[in-house]
Amino acid sequence: MRILSSPFRWFVLAVMALCLTIACAPQPTSNSPSSAARPLVSASNNWVGYSGHPVAVGKGFFQEAGLKVDDLFFQSAGEQITAFLANKIDLGWFTSGDAIQMMAKDPSIKIIYLIDYSNGSDGIIGRDIQKPQDAKGKTIARENILFEKVVLQAYLQKGGLTEKDVTIKDLAAADAAAAFAAKQVDMAVTYEPYLTKSAKQGGGEVIFSTKDTNLVADVVVARDQLIQSRAADLKTYFKAVDKAVKLLNTSDAEALKIAGTKLGVSGDEMKAQLQGATLFDIEGNKTIGFNPDSPKSLLGNLKVTAKAAYDFKIVPQPLKVETLYDDSIVKAL
């Protein structure tokens, strides 16, 4: 038989020893912390209900938990949607309508957490509009995204109207509000921190809002691969967000200041605007958000929003609600 030369034999033994060392070393799993992993890229926009995100960043809750998070902030939902679909974002804070709109292009996207229900901070401002029927023939500014279409549809239907009865001007929420304030449009679909202020500036009023409804839900979305590969990090992430939301729900002055600074308003203004959003913590996600037995469950909102997506021809066929979300992270918290 062939016998290895002494130097080569020692080389082979060294390689084998190295392989055994690597094989025996503890390997990271999706259920163990991954502090050495790349940062989670988390993005939100200028909706008041997303204030838990800047507070978690500003208070250092992610850092305290040993989680690296890159914080991105967008001035419009449309820009944020584009970035998420381009795989530039891991975790996105969106309306459920935005989420479903993206799922039509990427079915691997799933809703994994309920952030809030709009409770009056989304709405429509109008000038000389006394009833829904008065909207006929008017020029209305709204962004070409599903949740704003749903809000406008809910109002127009009360007057037996559709978008075919009005002129639509496609503008992001901030720009729509500015156009109304400048009296360039008759009505605008927008949200706080623009809704109330722009109504006054434009000589109008809030003629319709989401108060006492779950018409607009805000959620966190991620792709299947991230949910499976970084489950431990996602649990850490939402525990940090939970701490921030609890501060906001108790009107903590420092938290309100951090959130207000992000949106360009004072802490007192932030406190007032947050009255128009019902923020959910982990417990709320468990008992209401993903609880099919709750009358205010997110699942009811998804059913309505999925139907609207089909009606507006955003998706080619009706979507099954159970395919839109993954509640495994919430259940594990």
What are these regions (language model features)?
Residues 70, 78, 272-280, 320-332:
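Short linear loop/turn motifs
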Residues 1-39, 333:
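Short, low-complexity disordered leader/linker segments with a strong preference
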Residues 90, 97-98, 168-169, 175-264:
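Pocket-lining segment of extracytoplasmic ligand-binding domains
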Residues 31-163, 167-170, 186-192, 205-208:
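Short, glycine-/small- and polar/acidic-enriched structural segments
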Residues 229-314:
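Secondary-structure end/capping motifs
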Residues 302-333:
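Conserved C-terminal helix/tail region of periplasmic/extracytoplasmic solute-binding proteins
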Residues 51-55, 59-60, 82-86, 100, ...:
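Solvent-exposed, polar/charged alpha-helical surfaces in well-ordered, non-transmembrane soluble domains
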Residues 46, 73-77, 117, 145-149, ...:
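Solvent-exposed, acidic/flexible segments
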